[in-house]
Amino acid sequence: MEIRVFRQEDFEEVITLWERCDLLRPWNDPEMDIERKVNHDVSLFLVAEVSGEVVGTVMGGYDGHRGSAYYLGVHPEFRGRGIANALLNRLEKKLIARGCPKIQIMVRDDNDVVLGMYERLGYEHSDALSLGKRLIEDEEY
């Protein structure tokens, strides 16, 4: 397995992976999300590749105060092999190299399987409530 930065030729394969991982929501246009990330800071957009196939992704961010991770997903046939752990570990190392003191990950309430994985990796529940506001409307996906 190789973990590397997203390349433009990964575009369609990544969207297909996100569909298989049930990461897409109608209010988020994955093509726009990728385009925005590539134009902002592609170095924190990582893919895991096995035998030339993209089997995992994580999209990270850092605003100078805290890091974040989004679109963490692993192809269902490749789960249980440590790929998600490896992606998060690589992202954490990149964030630490930038001086990032902490990372935040938002997880849907009903995603118990992933919550357990994050807890095993040292992530803790916070008492903060996450609020959001759409600033630019995307086309429904």
Swiss-Prot record:
Keyword Transferase (UniProt): yes
Pfam families: Acetyltransf_1
Residues annotated as transmembrane: none
One term of GO molecular function: acyltransferase activity, transferring groups other than amino-acyl groups
Keywords: Acyltransferase, Transferase
CDD domains: NAT_SF
Top-rank taxon: Bacteria
Record-linked SUPFAM superfamilies: Acyl-CoA N-acyltransferases (Nat) (SSF55729)
Enzyme class: transferase
EC code: 2.3.1.-
Keyword Chloroplast listed: no
Domain N-acetyltransferase: 1-141
Protein family: Belongs to the acetyltransferase family. YpeA subfamily.
Family matches, as HAMAP family: Acetyltransf_YpeA
Protein name: Acetyltransferase YpeA
Annotated source species: Salmonella typhimurium (strain LT2 / SGSC1412 / ATCC 700720)
